[in-house]
Swiss-Prot record:
Topological domains, Mitochondrial matrix: 46-59
Identification of the protein by name: Cytochrome c oxidase subunit 2
Function text: Component of the cytochrome c oxidase, the last enzyme in the mitochondrial electron transport chain which drives oxidative phosphorylation. The respiratory chain contains 3 multisubunit complexes succinate dehydrogenase (complex II, CII), ubiquinol-cytochrome c oxidoreductase (cytochrome b-c1 complex, complex III, CIII) and cytochrome c oxidase (complex IV, CIV), that cooperate to transfer electrons derived from NADH and succinate to molecular oxygen, creating an electrochemical gradient over the inner membrane that drives transmembrane transport and the ATP synthase.
Lineage: Eukaryota, Metazoa, Chordata, Craniata, Vertebrata
Organism, scientific name: Rhinolophus darlingi (Darling's horseshoe bat)
Gene coding for it: MT-CO2
The protein's enzyme class: translocase
Residues at which Cu cation A1 binds: H161, C196, C200, M207
PROSITE patterns in alphabetical order: COX2 (PS00078), COX2_CUA (PS50857), COX2_TM (PS50999)
Any Pfam family the entry gives: COX2_TM
GO cellular component: mitochondrial inner membrane; respiratory chain complex IV
CDD domains, A to Z: CcO_II_C (cd13912)
Length: 227
């Protein structure tokens, strides 16, 4: 999860988030190189008194600054499209969980089980126990098995919401009347925190998301106790 004064991304705990971090570094390096080149050229123009006689008519330069940006855009677009297809592709999910956004809480339904559903509300600050996180703890966590492909179906009962868990690289809009889906796969166990990422009313800031990723045998034990 995030910590105070953090400037970078949260630690990646899913293959998608790892790919997003690599893509971020790849794109940032291209931006850095272009910015350095532009600043260098500007500094030369400002510090030299010489004038190039062919500046106003240079076919070779015009060809270069037309082709080179196109190549750079392709270098950015191809990895981006690859990640987009990875995020959209879901093959044989081991579990499906339906998530519904409400003002201002989330409800979850494990569609592979009968009568396994619950609402998840934020725990008020006055009810927090020592060590619990303000505005992030919920009364019912979403327990899921780790190292298994999980399909999340996301929608809303009232207004537009957004279901987001940064460390897993997940952010999917919850739109009334529309069912969106995303893939969830965690490499290691733990608690993963998120929040509603779309302004949805006065209590928008009080819609936390808590995922508890556990080994399969612990998940089976939990699901048996909940049914």
């Amino acid at each position: 999860m995030a910590h105070p004064f953090q400037l970078g991304f949260q630690d990646a705990t899913s293959p998608i988030m790892e790919e997003l971090l690599h893509f971020h570094d790849h794109t940032l390096m291209i931006v850095f190189l272009i910015s350095s080149l532009v600043l260098y050229i500007i500094s030369l123009l400002l510090t030299t008194s010489l004038t190039h006689t062919s500046t106003m008519d240079a076919q070779e330069v015009e060809t270069i600054w037309t082709i080179l940006p196109a190549i750079i855009l392709i270098m950015i677009a191809l990895p981006s499209l690859r990640i987009l297809y990875m995020m959209d592709e879901i093959n044989n999910p081991s579990l499906t969980v339906k998530t519904m956004g409400h003002q201002w809480y989330w409800s979850y339904e494990y569609t592979d089980y009968e009568d396994l559903s619950f609402d998840s509300y934020m725990i008020p600050t006055s009810d927090l126990k020592p060590g619990e996180l303000r505005l992030l703890e919920v009364d019912n966590r979403v327990v899921l098995p780790m190292e298994m492909t999980i399909r999340m179906l996301i929608s809303s009962e009232d207004v537009l919401h957004s279901w987001a868990v940064p460390s897993l690289g997940l952010k999917t809009d919850a739109i009334p009347g529309r069912l969106n889906q995303t893939t969830l796969l965690s490499n290691r166990p733990g608690l993963y925190y998120g929040q509603c990422s779309e302004i949805c009313g006065s209590n928008h800031s009080f819609m936390p998301i808590v995922l508890e990723l556990v080994p399969l045998k612990h998940f089976e034990k939990w699901s048996s106790s909940m049914v």
